[in-house]
C-alpha cells in the first residue's frame, strides 16, 4: 500500500473510530421510554441500562491493555469495532429486556476498548502529531455524542421500524469503522 493511501486510511480510522465512541450510549436516553414500553422493561432495569456504560467502561477498560498486548493493537481495535457494530445492530432488534441488555454490554465493551486504545493508536501512527489527532478524535467523539442524542427521537418517529431502526442505525455507522480496522498496516 502506498504511503499516502496508508495515511488517508489511518486518518479515516481515527475519525470513524471516534464517531462511534458515544452514539451507542447517547442515543438511548431520548427513546428510553419507547424502549421500556416495547420491551416491558421495568424502571429499575432502565436505570440499570443507563448505568451500564460506566460499569462496562471500567471493567473492560481494566483488561484492555492485556488484550492489546496479547492480540496486538490493530486486532484488538478490529475486535472492538466488530463487537460495537454487532452489539448495536442486534440489540435494536431484540424482543426482550435480557437480550437488549446483553447486546448493549457487547456494544459497550467495544466502546470501552476503543476508549482505552485510541490514545495508543494515535501515538503509534501519528507520533509527531499527537495533539492534533487527539483534538480530531475528541471533536468527532463529542460531535457525534451530541448529534446522535438530538436526531434519534426524530428518526424514531419517522422510521417504520421506530426506535429499533433509530438506535440500530448507529451500528451501521460502526460497520464503516470495521473497514479501516480490518486492513493490515
Q: Which residues does each predicted region cover?
A:
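Transmembrane alpha-helical segments of major facilitator superfamily
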Residues: 48-57, 141
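MFS-fold secondary transporters
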Residues: 87-91, 107, 181
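Extracytoplasmic
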Residues: 9-43, 61-64
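Residue-level signature of mid-helix packing/kink "hotspots" within the transmembrane helices
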Residues: 26, 54-62, 145-146
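Cytoplasmic helix-loop-helix junction between adjacent transmembrane helices
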Residues: 103-139
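Helix-loop-helix hairpin linking two adjacent transmembrane segments in secondary transporters
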Residues: 99, 128-129, 136-184
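Conserved MFS/SLC helix-loop-helix module at the cytosolic interface between two early adjacent transmembrane helices
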Residues: 59-98
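Juxtamembrane helix-start elements in MFS-like secondary transporters
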Residues: 42-50, 134
Amino acid at each position: 500500500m502506498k504511503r499516502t493511501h496508508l495515511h488517508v486510511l489511518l486518518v479515516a480510522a481515527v475519525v470513524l473510530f471516534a464517531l462511534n465512541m458515544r452514539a451507542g450510549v447517547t442515543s438511548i436516553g431520548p427513546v428510553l421510554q419507547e424502549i421500556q414500553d416495547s420491551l416491558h422493561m421495568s424502571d429499575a432495569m432502565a436505570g440499570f441500562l443507563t448505568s451500564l456504560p460506566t460499569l462496562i467502561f471500567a471493567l473492560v477498560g481494566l483488561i484492555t491493555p492485556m488484550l492489546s498486548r496479547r492480540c496486538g493493537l490493530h486486532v484488538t481495535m478490529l475486535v472492538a469495532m466488530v463487537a460495537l457494530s454487532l452489539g448495536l445492530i442486534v440489540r435494536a432488534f431484540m424482543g426482550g429486556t435480557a437480550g437488549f441488555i446483553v447486546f448493549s454490554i457487547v456494544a459497550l465493551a467495544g466502546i470501552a476498548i476503543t476508549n482505552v486504545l485510541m490514545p495508543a493508536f494515535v501515538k503509534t501512527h501519528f507520533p509527531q502529531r499527537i495533539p492534533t489527532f487527539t483534538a480530531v478524535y475528541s471533536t468527532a467523539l463529542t460531535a457525534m455524542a451530541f448529534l446522535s442524542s438530538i436526531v434519534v427521537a426524530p428518526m424514531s418517529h419517522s422510521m417504520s421500524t421506530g426506535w429499533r431502526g433509530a438506535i440500530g442505525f448507529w451500528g451501521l455507522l460502526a460497520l464503516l469503522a470495521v473497514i479501516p480496522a480490518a486492513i493490515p498496516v
